[in-house]
C-alpha cells in the first residue's frame, strides 16, 4: 500500500498580515518556518519515508517542503515543482487586506468570492503589481494559461491533469509521495480523493503545516486517513 502526505505550507507573511495571496510569491513567517520544521519532525517520528516530492512554484510551499524533508532526513529525494499545484489565483483581490476588502464590498460578497465553488473573484489586470502576466517562472506557458482569477472549480481543473499524469501513477507503482502546496490546491486534491461534494468542500479547512496522511490500496481507494499532530 502506498502513502500520500499533503502539507499546506507554513504560515506566510501575508497570512500574518491578513492579505489575499494567491499566486503572489511571499515568504514564510518565522512561525511558518517552525510549522514546517515541526511537520518534518512529525513525519520522522511516524517513520514515513518518501520516494517522490511535489510542490508548487511558490517560495512558501517550496521552503515548507525543504524544511520538512530536512527535519526528516529526506532532503535528497526526487522533487518536482509545478505551477499546477500553485494556490488558487485570487484575481484583483491579490495583495488586498481581507478586512478592508470586506468593509468595502461587504462580508457576504467577500465570503462568496472566497468560499463559493463556482464564483470567480474580479479578474486582475496585467499592469497590476500583483499580476503574474510578466513573471518569468511562467514564461514557458501559453499566455492564456496564466490565470487572471480562479475559483475552486477552476483550480481543481488545473490540478487534476498533474494528479493523473504524475501523482496517481507514482502511487499505483507503490511509491510514497509527499506534496507541499496550498490551502486551495490541496483542498482541490482532497475533494477528488475523498469524493467530497461541491458544497461540503468549501467548509474544509487545511491547517498550515499539518501533515495529512492517506494510505491507498492498489486501486487507489483510501483505506486510512490520519492527521499528524502532537
From Swiss-Prot:
Which EC numbers does the record give? 5.4.2.11
Q: Which GO terms describe its molecular function?
A: phosphoglycerate mutase activity
SMART domains assigned to the protein according to its UniProt record, in alphabetical order = PGAM
Q: Kind of enzyme, top EC level?
A: isomerase
Asked if the Swiss-Prot or TrEMBL record annotates the protein with the keyword GTP-binding, the reply is no
Pathway(s) where this gene product acts: Carbohydrate degradation; glycolysis; pyruvate from D-glyceraldehyde 3-phosphate: step 3/5
For site (Transition state stabilizer), what residue positions does UniProt give?
182
Which Pfam family is an annotated match for this chain, by its short name?
Answer: His_Phos_1
**Which cysteines in this chain are paired by disulphide bridges?**
none
Q: Which reaction does it catalyse?
A: (2R)-2-phosphoglycerate = (2R)-3-phosphoglycerate
- What keywords appear on the UniProt entry? Gluconeogenesis, Glycolysis, Isomerase
Which residues does substrate bind?
8-15, 21-22, 60, 87-90, 98, 114-115, 183-184
Single GO BP term: glycolytic process
Catalytic residue list: 9 (tele-phosphohistidine intermediate), 87 (proton donor/acceptor)
Q: State the source organism's domain of life.
A: Bacteria
Q: What does this protein do?
A: Catalyzes the interconversion of 2-phosphoglycerate and 3-phosphoglycerate.
Q: Which PANTHER family match?
A: PHOSPHOGLYCERATE MUTASE
Q: What family classification does the UniProt entry report for this protein?
A: Belongs to the phosphoglycerate mutase family. BPG-dependent PGAM subfamily.
The protein, known as: 2,3-bisphosphoglycerate-dependent phosphoglycerate mutase 1
Q: What's the source species for this entry?
A: Lactobacillus johnsonii (strain CNCM I-12250 / La1 / NCC 533)
Q: What is the lineage of its organism?
A: Bacteria, Bacillati, Bacillota, Bacilli, Lactobacillales
Q: Which gene is transcribed and translated to give this protein?
A: gpmA1
Amino acid at each position: 500500500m502506498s502513502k500520500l502526505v499533503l502539507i499546506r505550507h507554513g504560515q506566510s507573511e501575508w497570512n500574518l498580515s491578513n492579505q489575499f495571496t494567491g499566486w503572489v510569491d511571499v515568504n514564510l513567517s518565522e512561525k511558518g518556518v517552525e510549522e514546517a520544521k515541526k511537520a518534518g519532525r512529525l513525519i520522522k517520528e511516524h517513520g514515513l519515508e518518501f520516494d517522490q516530492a511535489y510542490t508548487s512554484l511558490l517560495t512558501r510551499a517550496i521552503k515548507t517542503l525543504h524544511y520538512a524533508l530536512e527535519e526528516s532526513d529526506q532532503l535528497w529525494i526526487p522533487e518536482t515543482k509545478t505551477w499546477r499545484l500553485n494556490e488558487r489565483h485570487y484575481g484583483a483581490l491579490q495583495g488586498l487586506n481581507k478586512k478592508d476588502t470586506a468593509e468595502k464590498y461587504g462580508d457576504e460578497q467577500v465570503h462568496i468570492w472566497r468560499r463559493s465553488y463556482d464564483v470567480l473573484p474580479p479578474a486582475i489586470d496585467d499592469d497590476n503589481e500583483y499580476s503574474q502576466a510578466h513573471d518569468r517562472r511562467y514564461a514557458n506557458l501559453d499566455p492564456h494559461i496564466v490565470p487572471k482569477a480562479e475559483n475552486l472549480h477552476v483550480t481543481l481543473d488545473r490540478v487534476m491533469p498533474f494528479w493523473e499524469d504524475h501523482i496517481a501513477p507514482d502511487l499505483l507503482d507503490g511509491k510514497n509521495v509527499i506534496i507541499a502546496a496550498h490551502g486551495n490546491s490541496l483542498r482541490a486534491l482532497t475533494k477528488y480523493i475523498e469524493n467530497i461534494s461541491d458544497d461540503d468542500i468549501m467548509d474544509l479547512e487545511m491547517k498550515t503545516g499539518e501533515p495529512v496522511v492517506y494510505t491507498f490500496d492498489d486501486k487507489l481507494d483510501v483505506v486510512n486517513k490520519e492527521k499528524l499532530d502532537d
